[in-house]
Protein backbone atom coordinates (compact mmCIF):
# COMPACT_ATOMS: atom_id res chain seq x y z
CA UNK A 1 0.00 0.00 0.00
CA UNK A 2 1.35 3.41 -0.96
CA UNK A 3 2.12 6.00 1.72
CA UNK A 4 -0.95 8.24 2.31
CA UNK A 5 1.41 11.21 2.41
CA UNK A 6 2.20 10.58 -1.25
CA UNK A 7 -1.16 9.28 -2.49
CA UNK A 8 -3.89 11.42 -0.88
CA UNK A 9 -4.69 14.35 -3.24
CA UNK A 10 -4.67 17.00 -0.47
CA UNK A 11 -1.89 15.64 1.76
CA UNK A 12 0.25 15.17 -1.37
CA UNK A 13 0.20 18.97 -1.93
CA UNK A 14 1.42 19.55 1.64
CA UNK A 15 4.04 16.82 1.17
CA UNK A 16 5.37 18.31 -2.05
CA UNK A 17 5.48 21.80 -0.51
CA UNK A 18 6.87 21.23 3.00
CA UNK A 19 8.17 17.68 3.40
CA UNK A 20 9.68 16.10 0.27
CA UNK A 21 10.38 19.46 -1.40
CA UNK A 22 13.96 19.41 -2.76
CA UNK A 23 15.84 22.43 -1.35
CA UNK A 24 19.41 23.63 -2.00
CA UNK A 25 21.80 22.29 0.66
CA UNK A 26 23.43 25.67 1.31
CA UNK A 27 20.58 28.16 1.89
CA UNK A 28 21.29 30.38 4.91
CA UNK A 29 19.13 31.90 7.65
CA UNK A 30 18.11 34.64 5.18
CA UNK A 31 15.79 32.01 3.65
CA UNK A 32 13.86 31.70 6.94
CA UNK A 33 11.76 34.81 6.41
CA UNK A 34 9.29 33.22 3.97
CA UNK A 35 8.03 30.82 6.63
CA UNK A 36 8.09 33.60 9.27
CA UNK A 37 5.89 35.72 7.00
CA UNK A 38 3.45 32.81 6.74
CA UNK A 39 3.33 32.60 10.55
CA UNK A 40 2.86 36.40 10.81
CA UNK A 41 -0.06 36.25 8.36
CA UNK A 42 -1.70 33.39 10.29
CA UNK A 43 -1.21 35.25 13.59
CA UNK A 44 -2.69 38.47 12.16
CA UNK A 45 -5.73 36.63 10.77
CA UNK A 46 -6.41 34.80 14.06
CA UNK A 47 -5.89 37.82 16.38
CA UNK A 48 -7.76 40.05 13.91
CA UNK A 49 -10.72 37.67 13.84
CA UNK A 50 -11.04 37.74 17.64
CA UNK A 51 -10.63 41.53 17.72
CA UNK A 52 -13.36 41.90 15.07
CA UNK A 53 -15.75 40.02 17.39
CA UNK A 54 -15.58 42.95 19.85
CA UNK A 55 -14.85 45.91 17.56
CA UNK A 56 -17.56 48.26 16.24
CA UNK A 57 -16.88 50.19 13.02
CA UNK A 58 -18.88 53.28 13.89
CA UNK A 59 -17.27 56.68 14.46
CA UNK A 60 -19.20 57.14 17.72
CA UNK A 61 -18.09 53.84 19.28
CA UNK A 62 -14.91 52.66 17.47
CA UNK A 63 -12.46 54.28 19.91
CA UNK A 64 -14.49 53.10 22.92
CA UNK A 65 -14.73 49.56 21.54
CA UNK A 66 -10.92 49.33 21.30
CA UNK A 67 -10.65 50.60 24.91
CA UNK A 68 -13.30 48.04 25.91
CA UNK A 69 -11.24 45.26 24.26
CA UNK A 70 -8.17 46.30 26.27
CA UNK A 71 -9.99 46.75 29.61
CA UNK A 72 -12.94 44.36 29.73
CA UNK A 73 -12.36 41.47 27.30
CA UNK A 74 -10.45 38.50 28.74
CA UNK A 75 -6.85 38.92 27.55
CA UNK A 76 -8.15 41.50 25.07
CA UNK A 77 -5.06 43.64 25.64
CA UNK A 78 -2.87 40.68 24.58
CA UNK A 79 -4.93 40.26 21.39
CA UNK A 80 -4.78 43.98 20.61
CA UNK A 81 -1.02 44.32 21.16
CA UNK A 82 -0.21 41.02 19.45
CA UNK A 83 -2.11 42.32 16.43
CA UNK A 84 -0.49 45.79 16.47
CA UNK A 85 3.07 44.57 17.11
CA UNK A 86 2.47 41.54 14.89
CA UNK A 87 2.07 44.03 12.03
CA UNK A 88 5.49 45.48 12.90
CA UNK A 89 7.06 42.00 12.91
CA UNK A 90 5.31 41.32 9.59
CA UNK A 91 6.97 44.36 8.02
CA UNK A 92 10.39 43.64 9.56
CA UNK A 93 10.23 40.15 8.01
CA UNK A 94 8.89 41.58 4.72
CA UNK A 95 11.71 44.11 4.34
CA UNK A 96 14.37 41.52 5.25
CA UNK A 97 12.77 39.06 2.80
CA UNK A 98 12.83 41.65 -0.02
CA UNK A 99 16.39 42.66 0.93
CA UNK A 100 17.47 39.01 0.72
CA UNK A 101 15.90 38.80 -2.74
CA UNK A 102 17.76 41.92 -3.88
CA UNK A 103 21.11 40.79 -2.47
CA UNK A 104 21.08 37.23 -3.80
CA UNK A 105 19.40 37.94 -7.15
CA UNK A 106 16.20 36.00 -6.34
CA UNK A 107 14.37 38.58 -8.49
CA UNK A 108 15.51 36.62 -11.56
CA UNK A 109 12.52 34.35 -10.85
CA UNK A 110 10.34 37.05 -12.43
CA UNK A 111 6.90 35.51 -11.76
CA UNK A 112 7.66 34.86 -8.08
CA UNK A 113 9.19 38.33 -7.71
CA UNK A 114 6.27 40.18 -9.35
CA UNK A 115 3.81 38.21 -7.23
CA UNK A 116 5.85 39.26 -4.19
CA UNK A 117 5.64 42.95 -5.18
CA UNK A 118 1.84 42.63 -5.53
CA UNK A 119 1.78 40.99 -2.08
CA UNK A 120 3.83 43.87 -0.65
CA UNK A 121 1.32 46.41 -1.99
CA UNK A 122 -1.60 44.34 -0.62
CA UNK A 123 -0.03 44.08 2.85
CA UNK A 124 0.74 47.83 2.88
CA UNK A 125 -2.87 48.63 1.93
CA UNK A 126 -4.16 46.31 4.67
CA UNK A 127 -1.86 47.84 7.30
CA UNK A 128 -2.88 51.38 6.33
CA UNK A 129 -6.59 50.57 6.64
CA UNK A 130 -6.00 48.77 9.94
CA UNK A 131 -4.29 51.85 11.37
CA UNK A 132 -7.47 53.86 10.73
CA UNK A 133 -9.74 51.51 12.71
CA UNK A 134 -8.94 52.53 16.35
CA UNK A 135 -10.22 56.01 15.34
CA UNK A 136 -7.62 57.97 17.29
CA UNK A 137 -6.19 61.31 16.16
CA UNK A 138 -3.43 59.75 14.04
CA UNK A 139 -5.93 57.25 12.56
CA UNK A 140 -8.24 60.03 11.41
CA UNK A 141 -5.60 62.46 10.16
CA UNK A 142 -3.50 59.70 8.59
CA UNK A 143 -6.57 58.54 6.65
CA UNK A 144 -7.38 62.13 5.63
CA UNK A 145 -3.86 62.94 4.43
CA UNK A 146 -3.17 59.67 2.58
CA UNK A 147 -6.57 59.37 0.84
CA UNK A 148 -6.32 63.06 -0.09
CA UNK A 149 -3.21 62.26 -2.14
CA UNK A 150 -5.47 60.71 -4.77
CA UNK A 151 -6.88 64.18 -5.47
CA UNK A 152 -3.54 64.86 -7.22
CA UNK A 153 -4.71 62.61 -10.08
CA UNK A 154 -5.70 64.97 -12.93
CA UNK A 155 -9.39 65.37 -13.85
CA UNK A 156 -10.84 62.48 -11.79
CA UNK A 157 -8.88 63.08 -8.55
CA UNK A 158 -11.47 64.97 -6.48
CA UNK A 159 -14.36 62.70 -7.49
CA UNK A 160 -12.21 59.65 -6.72
CA UNK A 161 -11.37 60.88 -3.20
CA UNK A 162 -15.02 61.66 -2.38
CA UNK A 163 -16.02 58.25 -3.76
CA UNK A 164 -13.48 56.53 -1.46
CA UNK A 165 -14.58 58.65 1.53
CA UNK A 166 -18.26 58.02 0.83
CA UNK A 167 -18.92 61.70 1.52
CA UNK A 168 -17.16 65.05 1.69
CA UNK A 169 -14.73 64.06 4.46
CA UNK A 170 -13.36 61.01 6.28
CA UNK A 171 -16.40 59.92 8.31
CA UNK A 172 -18.66 57.02 9.30
CA UNK A 173 -18.88 55.59 5.77
CA UNK A 174 -15.08 55.68 5.39
CA UNK A 175 -14.49 53.84 8.67
CA UNK A 176 -17.06 51.15 7.84
CA UNK A 177 -15.63 50.43 4.38
CA UNK A 178 -12.05 50.44 5.71
CA UNK A 179 -13.07 47.83 8.29
CA UNK A 180 -14.72 45.72 5.56
CA UNK A 181 -11.62 45.84 3.35
CA UNK A 182 -9.23 45.36 6.27
CA UNK A 183 -11.12 42.16 7.12
CA UNK A 184 -11.26 40.94 3.51
CA UNK A 185 -7.73 41.67 2.28
CA UNK A 186 -5.79 39.18 4.48
CA UNK A 187 -7.78 36.33 2.91
CA UNK A 188 -6.95 37.64 -0.56
CA UNK A 189 -3.31 37.89 0.59
CA UNK A 190 -3.48 34.21 1.67
CA UNK A 191 -4.59 33.25 -1.86
CA UNK A 192 -1.82 35.38 -3.40
CA UNK A 193 0.71 33.69 -1.08
CA UNK A 194 -0.32 30.32 -2.54
CA UNK A 195 0.27 31.66 -6.06
CA UNK A 196 3.63 33.08 -4.89
CA UNK A 197 4.61 29.59 -3.62
CA UNK A 198 3.24 27.93 -6.77
CA UNK A 199 5.58 30.06 -8.90
CA UNK A 200 8.49 29.45 -6.51
CA UNK A 201 8.05 25.67 -6.61
CA UNK A 202 8.11 25.76 -10.43
CA UNK A 203 11.75 26.89 -10.31
CA UNK A 204 12.93 25.80 -6.87
CA UNK A 205 14.75 28.04 -4.40
CA UNK A 206 17.72 30.24 -5.23
CA UNK A 207 20.81 29.93 -3.00
CA UNK A 208 23.56 32.27 -1.68
CA UNK A 209 25.96 31.53 -4.55
CA UNK A 210 23.36 32.25 -7.25
CA UNK A 211 24.55 29.10 -9.06
CA UNK A 212 21.94 26.42 -9.97
CA UNK A 213 21.85 23.79 -7.23
CA UNK A 214 20.00 21.01 -9.08
CA UNK A 215 22.84 18.57 -8.42
CA UNK A 216 22.95 19.20 -4.67
CA UNK A 217 19.48 19.16 -3.12
CA UNK A 218 18.23 17.93 0.27
CA UNK A 219 14.65 17.28 1.49
CA UNK A 220 12.96 20.24 3.16
CA UNK A 221 12.00 18.06 6.14
CA UNK A 222 13.75 17.59 8.58
CA UNK A 223 16.59 19.99 7.67
CA UNK A 224 14.75 23.21 6.95
CA UNK A 225 11.69 22.53 9.11
CA UNK A 226 14.01 22.50 12.15
CA UNK A 227 15.87 25.56 10.87
CA UNK A 228 12.58 27.43 10.35
CA UNK A 229 11.37 26.50 13.84
CA UNK A 230 14.52 28.06 15.35
CA UNK A 231 13.81 31.29 13.44
CA UNK A 232 10.18 31.10 14.55
CA UNK A 233 11.16 30.85 18.23
CA UNK A 234 13.46 33.85 17.85
CA UNK A 235 10.69 35.91 16.24
CA UNK A 236 8.16 34.88 18.90
CA UNK A 237 10.67 35.89 21.60
CA UNK A 238 11.03 39.39 20.10
CA UNK A 239 7.26 39.75 19.54
CA UNK A 240 6.30 38.63 23.06
CA UNK A 241 9.00 40.85 24.58
CA UNK A 242 7.45 43.80 22.71
CA UNK A 243 3.88 42.89 23.66
CA UNK A 244 4.60 42.20 27.33
CA UNK A 245 7.17 44.89 28.17
CA UNK A 246 6.65 47.86 25.84
CA UNK A 247 3.54 47.34 23.70
CA UNK A 248 3.32 51.02 22.71
CA UNK A 249 6.98 51.50 21.79
CA UNK A 250 6.29 51.46 18.04
CA UNK A 251 2.94 53.26 18.22
CA UNK A 252 2.06 56.95 18.34
CA UNK A 253 0.82 58.53 21.60
CA UNK A 254 -1.56 60.73 19.54
CA UNK A 255 -3.62 57.64 18.77
CA UNK A 256 -4.72 57.50 22.41
CA UNK A 257 -6.64 60.73 21.81
CA UNK A 258 -10.06 60.16 20.15
CA UNK A 259 -10.34 61.45 16.57
CA UNK A 260 -11.23 65.13 16.38
CA UNK A 261 -11.74 66.71 12.93
CA UNK A 262 -11.41 70.19 14.48
CA UNK A 263 -7.91 69.70 15.94
CA UNK A 264 -4.93 68.75 13.77
CA UNK A 265 -2.02 66.98 15.54
CA UNK A 266 1.30 68.92 15.32
CA UNK A 267 3.04 66.14 13.36
CA UNK A 268 0.98 63.80 11.19
CA UNK A 269 3.00 60.67 10.49
CA UNK A 270 2.22 57.04 9.63
CA UNK A 271 3.48 53.91 11.42
CA UNK A 272 7.29 53.40 11.36
CA UNK A 273 7.16 50.91 8.48
CA UNK A 274 5.79 53.56 6.07
CA UNK A 275 8.10 56.40 7.14
CA UNK A 276 10.66 55.88 4.33
CA UNK A 277 7.94 56.22 1.66
CA UNK A 278 6.38 59.15 3.56
CA UNK A 279 9.78 60.91 3.59
CA UNK A 280 10.06 60.47 -0.20
CA UNK A 281 6.51 61.85 -0.60
CA UNK A 282 7.30 64.92 1.53
CA UNK A 283 10.65 65.63 -0.13
CA UNK A 284 8.98 66.69 -3.40
CA UNK A 285 7.28 70.13 -3.21
CA UNK A 286 4.76 69.25 -5.96
CA UNK A 287 1.69 67.21 -4.93
CA UNK A 288 1.40 65.01 -8.04
CA UNK A 289 5.20 64.59 -8.18
CA UNK A 290 5.23 63.49 -4.55
CA UNK A 291 2.46 60.94 -5.12
CA UNK A 292 4.27 59.51 -8.17
CA UNK A 293 7.54 59.28 -6.20
CA UNK A 294 5.68 57.57 -3.34
CA UNK A 295 4.22 54.90 -5.64
CA UNK A 296 7.49 54.51 -7.56
CA UNK A 297 9.48 54.02 -4.35
CA UNK A 298 7.81 50.58 -4.05
CA UNK A 299 6.88 49.96 -7.72
CA UNK A 300 10.58 50.32 -8.66
CA UNK A 301 11.00 46.73 -7.38
CA UNK A 302 9.14 45.52 -10.51
CA UNK A 303 11.95 46.92 -12.69
CA UNK A 304 14.84 45.37 -10.72
CA UNK A 305 15.11 42.22 -12.93
CA UNK A 306 15.45 44.45 -16.02
CA UNK A 307 18.17 46.55 -14.35
CA UNK A 308 20.30 43.46 -13.66
CA UNK A 309 23.39 43.93 -15.85
CA UNK A 310 25.80 41.60 -14.05
CA UNK A 311 26.91 38.26 -15.49
CA UNK A 312 26.56 36.84 -11.96
CA UNK A 313 23.22 36.41 -10.27
CA UNK A 314 24.11 36.89 -6.61
CA UNK A 315 26.09 39.70 -4.94
CA UNK A 316 28.12 37.15 -2.93
CA UNK A 317 31.18 37.59 -5.16
CA UNK A 318 30.58 41.25 -6.14
CA UNK A 319 32.18 43.59 -3.56
CA UNK A 320 31.28 46.88 -5.34
CA UNK A 321 27.60 45.91 -5.60
CA UNK A 322 27.70 44.78 -1.95
CA UNK A 323 28.88 48.24 -0.85
CA UNK A 324 26.11 49.86 -2.90
CA UNK A 325 23.51 47.49 -1.43
CA UNK A 326 24.48 48.50 2.11
CA UNK A 327 24.54 52.15 1.02
CA UNK A 328 20.93 51.67 -0.14
CA UNK A 329 20.07 50.05 3.21
CA UNK A 330 21.60 52.99 5.12
CA UNK A 331 19.73 55.39 2.81
CA UNK A 332 16.40 53.68 3.59
CA UNK A 333 17.12 53.88 7.33
CA UNK A 334 17.92 57.60 6.89
CA UNK A 335 14.61 58.10 5.05
CA UNK A 336 12.78 56.23 7.85
CA UNK A 337 14.34 58.60 10.41
CA UNK A 338 13.51 61.70 8.33
CA UNK A 339 9.89 60.57 7.83
CA UNK A 340 9.36 60.83 11.58
CA UNK A 341 10.87 64.33 11.88
CA UNK A 342 9.07 67.69 11.48
CA UNK A 343 9.21 69.51 8.12
CA UNK A 344 11.99 71.99 8.93
CA UNK A 345 15.67 72.62 8.24
CA UNK A 346 17.88 70.50 8.14
CA UNK A 347 15.46 67.54 7.84
CA UNK A 348 13.95 68.75 4.55
CA UNK A 349 17.26 68.85 2.66
CA UNK A 350 18.45 65.54 4.19
CA UNK A 351 15.18 63.93 3.02
CA UNK A 352 15.55 65.35 -0.48
CA UNK A 353 19.16 64.16 -0.81
CA UNK A 354 18.26 60.71 0.57
CA UNK A 355 15.32 60.45 -1.88
CA UNK A 356 17.52 61.38 -4.86
CA UNK A 357 20.18 58.90 -3.71
CA UNK A 358 17.55 56.13 -3.35
CA UNK A 359 16.36 56.36 -6.97
CA UNK A 360 19.84 57.13 -8.34
CA UNK A 361 21.39 54.08 -6.63
CA UNK A 362 18.77 51.65 -7.94
CA UNK A 363 18.29 53.06 -11.45
CA UNK A 364 21.81 54.22 -12.36
CA UNK A 365 24.66 53.46 -9.95
CA UNK A 366 24.01 49.75 -9.31
CA UNK A 367 23.56 48.74 -13.00
CA UNK A 368 26.76 50.68 -13.88
CA UNK A 369 28.66 49.06 -10.99
CA UNK A 370 27.57 45.62 -12.26
CA UNK A 371 28.91 46.45 -15.73
CA UNK A 372 32.18 47.62 -14.15
CA UNK A 373 32.46 44.32 -12.24
CA UNK A 374 31.89 42.37 -15.47
CA UNK A 375 34.69 44.41 -17.08
CA UNK A 376 37.05 43.84 -14.12
CA UNK A 377 36.48 40.09 -14.43
CA UNK A 378 37.04 40.39 -18.23
CA UNK A 379 33.55 38.97 -18.88
From Swiss-Prot:
It is found in: Mitochondrion inner membrane. Heme b b562 binds at residues 83, 182. The keyword Transmembrane applies. Its cofactor is heme b. A ubiquinone binds at residue 201. GO terms for molecular function: metal ion binding; ubiquinol-cytochrome-c reductase activity. Component of the ubiquinol-cytochrome c reductase complex (complex III or cytochrome b-c1 complex) that is part of the mitochondrial respiratory chain. The b-c1 complex mediates electron transfer from ubiquinol to cytochrome c. Contributes to the generation of a proton gradient across the mitochondrial membrane that is then used for ATP synthesis. Belongs to the cytochrome b family. This is Cytochrome b.
